[in-house]
Structure formats: structure tokens, C-alpha cells
Amino acid sequence: MKKLIALLLAVMMVLSLAACGKTEAPAAGEENNEATTGNVENNDAVAAPADFKVGAIYINSKNDTAGYTFAHHNGITTAMKELGLNPDTQLLIVDEVPEDMEQVKSAIDTLVGQGANIIFGISFGYIDAMEEAAAEYPDVIFSHGTGYKSNSTNFNNYFGRAYQARYLAGIAAGFKSLEIGNNNVGYVAAYGTEYAETASGINGFAMGVLAVNPNATIYVKTLGAWADEVNESAYAIELIDTFGCGVISQHCDSAQPQIAAQNKGVFGCGYNSDMTLDAPKAHLTAAIWNWNVYYRTAMKAAMECGEASNFVATMGSSAYYGGLAEGFVDVSPLSENCAAGTAEAIEAVKALIISGEWDVFSGVKLEIAADGTYTMVDADLVDNNGNVIVAAGGPSVEDGVITGTMNYFVAGVKAA
């Protein structure tokens, strides 16, 4: 870190830059918790020191070819290349790290010992270990994916509006359910209402399905783990065989639900990465993350901020929360398996969300016609117990609900 600081100071003196001076750091004990929703700065011209090291802790293998870890690894390496960093020599990885406090701490210690300047931990269960490490290693930057903890100096969190992308994927599933004449849609999820992350994703997908096919029922089978390839396949098969589901979606790490869907002759919507290659006869589209959008911003801030303690101030917030408008989430290219009208509807709704005129969890629902056009209708947002979450015409629930306290399924969703 000392070498990095010296080099950065020299560069800034020569170029008369003052990147970290753009934002005043919060006073001790204070923190800016308002999420940054746009790119902090899209100018990637930044000195890339040869001794700058990026550390990453992955829950699955760095060699995965699809799914959650694959998407993060691709995002990190893409961002590094965009910034002039060399992943072959400047990326340090500890992979296949379970959500176990001691194992995560060991991975962090390894990366710090190898000289990492910034460490990304991509799994929710790493949260407490990263919080402790940020205090133990104040000269290192810690950035936690999908979490909510942070400090005012060297520790932030990042996530995004995945529910927006899932709504779009739900549109594809809804059109396909109508085409095949099957109102039963299945969903293999890591967890259900225990976590707002999974609940909001399931609800967003379901609302997209129901906007196209109001007679649909979405059956959810939960794994109790973020990754479990055996049961990811088994539960998809159960949803097909027991509940008669004709489309299978997922919130889990591998492509196994899509492969199971193909083997059973039905269709599916993946997650994290385009899974068409894994299940070319079944896959419709996937809700995906463009993780490089965030990783580029964070790495750039880490190289510009001079001291790790200035990182959060340089980022402008201790939390990053991007969506369709920032290009942080999206859907993968639609496959030839999609039904007529799907592309038109997804493009129209995507433009509506990006415009800021409408969002998913509001008291205004969309009714999507066969030609892909939509009508906006004031309607109560109701959970599957009949409770009104948002009254007809009301604004979207707050971000804090979507990321923290959404512990219900919307009407139309059933636990399998």
C-alpha cells in the first residue's frame, strides 16, 4: 500500500489531479448510507500502478463456465482490462470458500498477505468476516457483494435492482406459458422469504409472468443454500413432475435447473449468465448482472483515493445500488425459444423502467397484450395472504424494503 500511495501521489502532483478531494469524508462516526445508483464516473483514464492488486473471494470455482461465480469473475477481469490492469498478474483469488466465518477470515488473511489493495467478497455470508477485517486491516479496502454492512472509510457494499431484470425474464416466461397452454411456472430458489434478496427476486419474476398471464401460478421450491447442484436439478424435476410446470426459473448458482428443464422437454429462464449454451432447447433468457459496471467504478476509486480510508468518500456512498438505468442488470439475449411478442414487450417495459416513470413494486400494475404493448392500471399490490402492501396508485415500496425487509410473496406465488 505504501508503494501504491507514493506512486499515486507522484502521478497526482504531475497531473495536478485531486480525485479524492472531490468529496469530503464524513466526520468520525458518521456515514453516507444513501446508495449510489449511477456510475460514479465513467472516465476510465486513471493511472494503473503495476503493484496494485485486486483480491477476490469466490464461493464457487473460478473455472465455472456459467452461474454466479462465473458472472462475478467475468465482471472483475473485464473491469481490470478496461482500467489497464492485468488479471494474470494483478488479480489474487481464493475460490470455493464457503460461508464459514473462519474460512472467510483465512481467505482474507491470505489475500492481505499477498498484498491485495482491495478485496471483493461476493457471497452474502461473508458479511461478518469482512466487517471485522475492515477494522483489522484499515489500509486495505473491503467491498462486499449483496450485503448491507459498511463503514465510513474502507468498507462498502454493493448490489442492484435484480428484481427489474427478473420482471423482464418473467415476461418471457409468461408469454411462453401462454404459447404452450400451461399456467404453471416453477422457480428453484436458494431461499424464500428468509431473505429480501430472494423474496424480491421471486416477486419481481412472478409479477412479470402475471402481467402477461394473469391466470398463472408460480410454484417456489427452496434449497436452503445458495448453491446445491444436486438439488437444483432435483427440485426443478419435482416442480415439473409434481406441479406440472412448463417453465422453470431460478435463483441459484448453476445451470442445473435449465438443464433439467431441457431434459424434461419444458422451458426455462436462467440467472447470472446466459444459459442458452447449457440448455439450448429450453432456455428463453436470463436475468443477468453486468458486474463490471460496479467493479470498474470501485477499482478506479481504489486507485484514485490515495488512502484506503478515503475509499467510501471517493465512491460517494457506502452502498452501491444500480439497476437497468445504469446498465448494472439486464436480461440476456432472447433465444429462438421465446414466444411471439416477447421481445416487443421486454423492450417496451425496459424503456419504461429506465425512464423512471414506473417501477415494479408499486400500486400500478402492467397488463401486457399479445402484441407486446402494455396498459398501466392502478391496482393494489397484495401479498399471497391478501394483505395490501401498496394501495392502488401508490408509489413503489422503498429500497430499504426491497433490500432488507421484504419477507412475503406476492399474490400468485405458492411455496411448493
Predicted regions and their residues:
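C-terminal motif of bacterial Sec signal peptides marking the signal peptidase cleavage site
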Residues: 16-19
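A residue-level marker of the well-folded mature domains of exported/periplasmic proteins
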Residues: 22, 28-416
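Sequence-pattern detector for short linear motifs
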Residues: 5-6, 23-25
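Positively charged n-region of N-terminal signal peptides that target proteins for export
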Residues: 1-9
